[in-house]
Structures are given as C-alpha cells and as structure tokens.
C-alpha cells in the first residue's frame, strides 16, 4: 500500500 492509497483505506 502506497501513501496515496493508505490514506483512503
């Protein structure tokens, strides 16, 4: 999980 996606999840 990269920084952009981990914020969403």
From Swiss-Prot:
Primary residence: secreted
Record key words, sorted: Secreted
Compartments reported by the entry: Secreted
Keyword Nucleotide-binding in annotation: no
Entry comment describing in which tissues the protein is expressed: Expressed by the venom gland.
Name of this chain's protein: Venom peptide 2
Keyword Nucleus: no
Gene Ontology CC, one term: extracellular region
Disulfide-bond pairs as recorded: none
């Amino acid at each position: 999980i990269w920084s952009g996606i981990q914020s969403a999840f």
